[in-house]
Amino acid sequence: MSKHARLQMGVMPAAAAFALLSILSFPAFAASNEGRFSLVLNGAAVKDNQTGLVWEQEPDREHDVWSRSNERCASKDVGGQKGWRGPSVEELKTLIDPAQRDPALPPGHPFSNIKSEIYWTSTPDPKDDIVAWQVSFFSGEPVTDQKSGTRRMWCVLEK
């Protein structure tokens, strides 16, 4: 047997084992990701079939302070639908895939214009009036920062 053939025989089982281990490490997430998202409102929005939340298909491109970002969501008309708002920290965290980084979204997600940035949530910090919660789509972690900073916001449809 050639050296190349022996190398391939060693690499293939290792690759298969790694793939299987990856799937088994996150079985609930891998199984639940199938059919998770549906395009709605003529493709302008995405329904998360796990949570029932409807998200903009393409998050806001504007970087703005917390208050104006929330106001912009409230005034939006996406796919002919009004009633948008800034998401809570808990709602925005539902989009995170803990196995992914940069961006921390599930593979095959239908969103566009996703940046591995920190996005505002509508959740203020209860201990500090000048601070609000955000979610990093690079790491998938929630963080806080001053409301005077500029970030993008990913609007969600009011239930």
Task: Identify the role of each PLM range.
Residues 2-85, 89-159:
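Glycine-aromatic-enriched surface loops/turns that form tight recognition elements
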